[in-house]
Amino acid sequence: MPKPVIAIVGRPNVGKSTIFNRIVGERVSIVEDIPGITRDRIYSAGEWLNHEFNIIDTGGIDIGDEPFLTQIRQQAEVAIDEADVIIFMTNGRDGVTAADEEVAKILYRSKKPIVLAVNKVDNPEMRSDIYDFYSLGFGEPFPISGTHGLGLGDLLDEAANHFPKIEEEAYDDETIRFSLIGRPNVGKSSLVNALLGQERVIVSNIAGTTRDAVDTPYSKDDQDYVIIDTAGMRKKGKVYESTEKYSVLRALRAIERSDVVLVVLDGEEGIIEQDKKIAGYAHDSGRAVIIVVNKWDAVKKDEKTMKAFEENIRAHFQFLDYAPIVFLSAKTKKRTQTLLPVINEVNESHSIRVQTNVLNDVIMDAVAMNPTPTHNGSRLKIFYATQVAVKPPTFVVFVNDTELMHFSYERFLKNRLREAFGFVGTPIHIIARARD
């Protein structure tokens, strides 16, 4: 189930970023910061009491016509579109302004739950000034102070009351759910259409558990699939394609509901830094991963080109050394038929469960081949191992001292497990635990 999304929206200079930093920095324990955009403090993930959520800080909405103000307004509207709950931020010192009323009009159209926050209410005497904000039409205003951190608990409690209820997904365990992620214009939608047009067996379009998600089920060779995508990722136009930071949120939502993630690259344009960041999201999720090089038809090539491109991928994506690479062209449909078998393979690997006795035979053979490391005269001793989870395969290795498990030896053990059991396209987790 994807995490709920809160967007903080308001005119300039009402303290949105201050409240954002308060929420993610103090009153909420951070779960993770999204790489590549945290330096702008745009988007973070955290939890409040028993609720995990993602939170977006937007630029101030301004009614001016200057190009940069228009872009800020467009980006804020994208954030509103993504949000499950909107915190409408105002400034208690200024009272209700014409700009607040303009923001309110935008929020009315969103049809989203709105929590009205009146910032800069820094002492109890100022609370009597908040009642004018009822005129905005969003019910009870919540007085808060970004400077002193006052009132944030009540504000987040109210926001959490509007989080979507958890729904059960309507797909059985045998259905493989996969998503396509990548920067704009790498051909994700074209690849979806190539797959669906090729198979001609679309069952229906089913709205997913999130408002934006569109699940497209289809079947091939008695195997059911669901392509998980978001409507926003397929839209064309400057508003969506110019707001790259918010496309990250759509990708994360799709990843969270997937068994397999396809990281789509542009073979014609090559690899850029944003590709690495997006691939990092897939790796960190623990899902099975396939790297897809699209637009291969447009690449001038000889017998060495594919190998050279693959080596370049491995050099840039060292953390995805387990992910198979598929070269294809959505436009010409060349090699698209090779994709589903690879999806099947990595999905199966993602769910492999190894018998404990077989696992320990492999671990002990590995130790015999490469003795465990020592540190300050103490040697790591491995007693036994057991698998505790699948999706991804996760193993607990019981040892005498967890500090002696060097990352390089852990990597060696992972490589031996891959050699023994395959694990194509799936990360492996090893947890060292001291034996009682």
Swiss-Prot record:
An MF annotation (GO) of this entry: ribosome binding
Record-annotated EngA-type G domain positions: 4-167, 176-351
UniProt keyword annotations, A-Z: GTP-binding, Nucleotide-binding, Repeat, Ribosome biogenesis
Gene Ontology biological-process entries: ribosome biogenesis
Residues bound to GTP 1: 10-17, 57-61, 119-122
Tagged with keyword GTP-binding: yes
Matching Pfam families: KH_dom-like, MMR_HSR1
Binding site for GTP 2: 182-189, 229-233, 294-297
SUPFAM superfamilies from the UniProt entry: P-loop containing nucleoside triphosphate hydrolases
InterPro entries according to UniProt: G_ENGA (IPR031166), GTP-bd (IPR006073), GTPase_Der (IPR016484), KH_dom-like (IPR032859), KH_dom-like_a/b (IPR015946), P-loop_NTPase (IPR027417), Small_GTP-bd (IPR005225)
Protein's UniProt keywords contain rRNA processing: no
Domain of life, per lineage: Bacteria
Domain KH-like: 352-436
NCBIfam families, per database record: GTPase_EngA (TIGR03594), small_GTP (TIGR00231)
PANTHER family the UniProt entry points to: GTPASE DER (PTHR43834:SF6)
Subunit structure comment from the entry: Associates with the 50S ribosomal subunit.
Homology family: Belongs to the TRAFAC class TrmE-Era-EngA-EngB-Septin-like GTPase superfamily. EngA (Der) GTPase family.
HAMAP family: GTPase_Der
Reported function: GTPase that plays an essential role in the late steps of ribosome biogenesis.
Protein name listed in UniProt: GTPase Der
Lineage: Bacteria, Bacillati, Bacillota, Bacilli, Bacillales
Gene of this entry: der
